[in-house]
């Protein structure tokens, strides 16, 4: 008799995705982040659901309702901090996943990569609207500053901003709609993630060498289920350590002050995972130019497959490209640091240089280095 998991219409899908999936035998731990992102998404939806049961999206009660969750709801404090720090873990996994894709040439799977870029934008949008919900000072001013950037769009900018706000400033209407967006977007992310997987399973996984591995595949279960479980345990351990020992380490103290439209915080800045893009935005003195640079800093990922000039897919055997890749990582860390600093003399020039280097590395240096490496292969 045939096994039910191979015949049942629903179980067959699960079987082909998580059990009998042919997987390259040599994929490293950098391939763990896909499953970890799935785990993060599930955790965020579950903790978010329980938070939504007690939260009120109204300017007069939003801040109090978050305080109420932390003080009066059974284990509300841990649900709230798991959700807040879970977002940080989500972005750590996301950036590692993207870095893996860049290093090993996974972007050659065009459809999978493009859905991934759309997913990144969606996750960033979700995190942004979510940060507004506690209605602290940084929530309010972050929402004001970032939505105001749209006013740089010629002709329709001002109308567009007021349409998003639902009035002439960030107010009740804005908070209510942001809560609605924050609730619906994770389900859109889930749907996109499924499409991401469908496209990936059309081609099969890449591997560290970048060489086709069709002749050397192993079943996903038990080999990679056990490997993913180890990754999941490490992720949960890190999240719990962060949540239970330093819940506010990655947050902003200003967000413990209720939103006040009459008092601007000294330094308006987003959460750490957006600081690199914020630094690029601030490094251009022109408003529209800054907005375009901000958008392009993420959108540039969609052009990565077109900028691939190497005859090899992976960077595994390309030392010069490896050097530039780690230079890019260091540059992004520098931008992240700059984004959290005030707009003053030493930081401004460092931010501008780091921003120039970011675009220069991706658009010029990496493609040119790949061409040089192609020549060197003939020696």
Swiss-Prot record:
Coiled coil: none annotated. It is found in: Mitochondrion inner membrane. GO terms for biological process: mitochondrial electron transport, ubiquinol to cytochrome c. Its main location: mitochondrion. Heme b b566 binds at residues 97, 196. Keywords: Electron transport, Heme, Iron, Membrane, Metal-binding, Mitochondrion, Mitochondrion inner membrane, Respiratory chain, Transmembrane, Transmembrane helix, Transport, Ubiquinone. Heme 1 (or BL or b562) is low-potential and absorbs at about 562 nm, and heme 2 (or BH or b566) is high-potential and absorbs at about 566 nm. This is Cytochrome b. The gene is MT-CYB.
């Amino acid at each position: 008799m045939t096994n039910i998991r191979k015949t049942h219409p629903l179980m067959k899908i699960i079987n082909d995705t998580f059990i009998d999936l042919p997987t390259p035998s040599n994929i490293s731990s950098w391939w763990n982040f896909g499953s970890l992102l799935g785990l993060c998404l599930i955790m965020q939806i579950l903790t978010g659901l329980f938070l939504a049961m007690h939260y009120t999206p109204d300017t007069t009660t939003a801040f109090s309702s978050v305080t109420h969750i932390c003080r009066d709801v059974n284990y509300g404090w841990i649900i709230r901090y798991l959700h807040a720090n879970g977002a940080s873990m989500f972005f750590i996994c996301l950036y590692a996943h993207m870095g893996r894709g860049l290093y090993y040439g996974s972007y050659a799977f065009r459809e999978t990569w493009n859905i991934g870029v759309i997913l990144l934008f969606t996750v960033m949008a979700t995190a942004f609207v979510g940060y507004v919900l506690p209605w602290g000072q940084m929530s309010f001013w972050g929402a004001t500053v970032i939505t105001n950037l749209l006013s740089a769009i010629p002709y329709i900018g001002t109308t567009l901003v007021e349409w998003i706000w639902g009035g002439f400033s960030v107010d009740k209407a804005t908070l209510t709609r942001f809560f609605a967006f924050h609730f619906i977007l994770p389900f859109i992310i889930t749907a996109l993630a499924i499409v991401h997987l469908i496209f990936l399973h059309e081609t099969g996984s890449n591997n560290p060498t970048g060489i086709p591995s069709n002749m050397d595949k192993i079943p996903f279960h038990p080999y990679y289920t056990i490997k993913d479980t180890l990754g999941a345990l490490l992720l949960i351990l890190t999240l719990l350590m962060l949540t239970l020992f330093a819940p506010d380490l990655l947050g902003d103290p200003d967000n413990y002050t209720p939103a006040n439209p009459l008092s601007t915080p000294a330094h308006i800045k987003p959460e750490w995972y957006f600081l690199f893009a914020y630094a690029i935005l601030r490094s251009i003195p022109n408003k529209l130019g800054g907005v375009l640079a901000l958008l392009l800093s993420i959108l540039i990922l969609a052009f990565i497959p077109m900028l691939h000039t190497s005859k090899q897919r992976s960077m595994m055997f390309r030392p010069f490209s490896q050097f530039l890749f780690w230079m890019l990582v260091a540059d992004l860390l520098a931008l992240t640091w700059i984004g959290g600093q005030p707009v003053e003399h030493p930081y401004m020039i460092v931010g501008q240089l780091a921003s120039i280097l970011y675009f220069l590395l991706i658009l010029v240096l990496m493609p040119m280095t790949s061409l040089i490496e192609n020549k060197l292969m003939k020696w």
